[in-house]
Structure formats: structure tokens, C-alpha cells
Amino acid sequence: MNEAYLEVLRPGINTTIQDKGRFHLYHIGITASGAMDQSKFQISNALVNNDLNEGALEFAYQGPCLKLVNANINIAITGNINFNILRKNSTTEEGICFKSYFLEDGDQIDIISTKNSVFGYFAVQGGFKTDKVWNSFSINTKARVGPNNGEKFSLGQKIYINKSKTEKLLEKKIDYNFLNENIIRVIKGTNYNYFSESALNIFFKEEYTVSNLSDRMGMRLEGPKLENITNTNIKSEGLVKGVIQVPADGKPIIMFCDHGTIGGYPKIAVVISADYDKVAQLPPGSKIKFKEVSLINAENYFKDHINNIEKYIREVK
């Protein structure tokens, strides 16, 4: 039986497979990785009846152009994305996000670009035919960990999919509410007291701009310098996703999914889990303001965030 696959006609800027991530490996220097926007990743799987942790393609800015070979499949794209479906009969459909589509052998999907955002997700019913590495499908290109030899997909590659008897699903879609907020909530970092009162006032009152020097490892911010009154270099300590480090130049860096497991810069704050998807989707040039919240409130906001994701998933069902 011929294997089913997606042929990469254009790889896009950074197309990889991601899931919820790999965990409990920090002690050997392996970070969690995983989808940058977990809510949209999970919803993409829900739209095609997959397990919510099934591997999906994640792309940034410009996505891939893919041709389906030897299969008929149900697919879904989530995010704020421009994309077209090029049918083998030469007709073209303008795609709608958060909606399932049925692709037939020979159809192409052209993921043109993200809109006022960074990441999008492409899920196929049944998932991709690849092995987990360290119990996860996630690819970390910096560490070369994960399927596809830890690398992003390239021109001409075949991305194999699990082939099964696939029938066209009843159309599934949801009305997703996009909120373009620039207020990012944080809790105090472990080195909060390393910074002057003036620096703390600046951090919470002034606006920062997302730099072009941002990727899956971290987001650099441009803005007023933060004065460190203790030491700009400390003994390396463990890092977590969302922690905000301040190096010697005084400009904050938010650590993302592919962050190193340890770091030697003071940590002024940590983005709360409820706001992580939101901050990850801010493109270069976006403005950010930070707001301090208590740990108890951060936990409650996260519960609300999870409930909101589950609400969308129930709407799909």
C-alpha cells in the first residue's frame, strides 16, 4: 500500500511538529519545548477528532505550501492566518481558520502568512506518522531534539501521515474570539530585589517593544534600561517558561518554549501561565506593558484560561 504524505512545496519560515511538550527532563538539560500557543494547538486537534496532544504542524509568520499524496484527509488550521486550498480540479478556496476541511489526493494547501500574530497550527486527522523522542513529538531545532532529526521541515520533504479509512467529517468550526491585548500579567521573579526602586517603577509603568530578535527560545524587548543594584551576572539557576531575565544591557528577555534549562541573569518577573499564549503571539513592533499580580490570582487566572480552552473544545464537539 502506498504511503500517505504531504509533499513540502514551500517549507515556510519555521515549520515543525509540536505537541504539549516533553517534561521531567530539565535535570539532564532538556527543556519542554511544545507548542508556543497551547490553546490554538489543542483546538486544531479537536477540530479533526484527534487526541488533544496529537502532534500538529506549527509555523511562524509564513507557513508551508503542502501537497497531499495518496490519501484523503480531514484537516484544520488555527490561528489568525491567510491560507488557500488549491483543489486538484484547479479551483481555489479561501481558507477560514478554526474550521475543518476535507482534502483529497492531489489537493494543495498554501499557508500564506499569519495576520497580526506569529504562530499558527495545522492538524490532520489521525496525526503524523513519526516516532516520539523523549515521549514527545515536539521539535527543538536549537538543541536538535525531536522527530525529523530535530530540524524544521525543508523543501521537497515528505511529511508522512497516518493513513486510515477516512470519511469526510461533518464540517466543524468554532467562532474564536481574538483579543489583541498588550497588558501582560506577571508575578515577582526570584531576583526581584536585585533591581532599584526606579527600575521597578519603569518596568511596570513604561511600555516595551517586541524586538525582531525573538524566536521560540525567547523574546527580546526594546525600551528603557533597567538598573541592577546588585549584580548583572549571578550563579546559573534553573529557568522556567515565561521567566523574564535582565542581562547587563538592562533590556528584558522573556524565555519561551525552547529556553535553556539554566541561566545566569537576574530574573525580575515571570509571565503568568494564563498570559503565555498571548505574549507568544505578539509580533515584532508590538507594545507590551507589564502588570504585577499575586500568586493566588495568577493561579485563578490560569484556571479561567483552562476553562476557556475547554469551552471552545466543547463547542467543537
Regions found by a protein language model. Give the residues of each.
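Conserved "landmark" site that anchors the functional core of diverse proteins
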Residues: M1-K317
